[in-house]
A protein has these predicted regions:
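Short aromatic/hydrophobic "clamp" motif used to bind/position activated sugar donors
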Residues: 81
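The conserved acidic donor/metal-binding loop of glycosyltransferases
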Residues: 85-89
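Short, acidic, metal-binding catalytic loop of nucleotide-sugar glycosyltransferases
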Residues: 21-30
């Protein structure tokens, strides 16, 4: 069974280079990498790889994440699909473990992600990534479970799909109807996708040994730069599923007096929008690994 790795890119060249290097160093390399570009032109001078790299351009000034994922799937040649965020660096067994899990049984498989501090990524003298350093510095998110390297564990909650690293078969993506492209900008489209997969009776599992390291980028708490998209996408999700997603961020906005909302409410009322100083003040220090 052949396997396509898929990633989405907007202005993350160095992170993409590191992802590509890590995929080329896999115990079992992907049979291709599909890059969905959410920018006017693809990056140039990318590293050579021992697998084909295919490109698809995705239009949209706002971050068209759902459209880009669907475009990547449509471009992929193979039935087994591994989605990796461009901020990820794959550990050497990631593709091998996802491939093993999908051969064993179709479903949605989630891999562990450990978060790196700023300036964690280093190259060795031979130009390869210093994986020992990444393993030493990577930190597990407190909301995520630890998985043994050879373990496959059922996951009953579809809400635990975070879009950084997961795998499934093309047929299950099709059964779920793909991603809803009415979600535009940051937030909500992955949770909606998870519930669509669950409604299609696709089983969810954690798979050990499919570890990725998340490369650091600027973080905000509350995530004011994505305020408008989060509100619009949360409303869309609630209309479809009659409950809220992104509750953690909505609570932050509510506590800051920007929205009138509660988990039991059936609507969000925007009271004010963040100002430039408020956005700047919410930027977390470089030591923060997640918001």
């Amino acid at each position: 069974m052949k396997l396509s790795a898929l990633t989405l890119v907007r202005h993350r060249r160095e992170h993409l280079v590191n992802l590509m290097l890590s995929l080329d160093a896999q115990h079992r390399r992907p049979d291709e990498l599909v890059i969905a570009w959410m920018q006017p032109e693809p990056e140039t001078n990318l590293p050579a790889t021992r697998f084909p790299v295919r490109h698809v351009m995705v239009e949209g000034d706002a971050l068209p994440l759902a459209r880009a994922r669907n475009a990547a799937v449509a471009t992929a040649r193979f039935e087994a699909l591994v989605f990796l965020d461009v901020d990820c660096i794959a550990s050497p067994t990631l593709v091998e473990r996802y491939h093993h899990a999908l051969r064993r049984r179709a479903g949605l498989y989630l891999g562990e992600v450990h978060y790196l501090p700023a300036d964690a990524v280093r190259r060795r003298a031979d130009g390869m990534l210093d994986r020992e350093r990444l393993a030493r510095l990577g930190e597990q998110h407190p909301a995520r479970p630890a998985i043994e390297a050879d373990e496959i564990r059922p996951e009953p909650d579809p809400g635990n799909l975070w879009g950084l690293s997961f795998a499934l078969m093309r047929e299950d993506h099709r059964r779920a109807g793909g991603m809803d492209e009415e979600y535009v900008g940051y937030g909500g489209e992955e949770t909606d996708y998870a519930w669509r997969l669950a409604a299609a009776e696709v089983p969810f599992h954690w798979v050990g040994g499919a570890l990725a390291w998340h490369q650091h980028h600027p973080l905000y708490a509350p995530p004011w730069p994505h305020f408008d998209a989060i509100i619009a996408n949360a409303r869309r999700f609630h209309r479809r599923w009659q409950h809220w997603c992104m509750d953690y961020w909505l609570e932050q906005f509510s506590e800051a007096g920007a929205i009138d909302w509660s988990p039991s409410a059936d609507r969000i009322e925007v009271l004010r929008r963040p100002g430039e100083q408020e956005i700047a003040a919410a930027r977390l220090p470089a030591s923060a690994r997640y918001g």
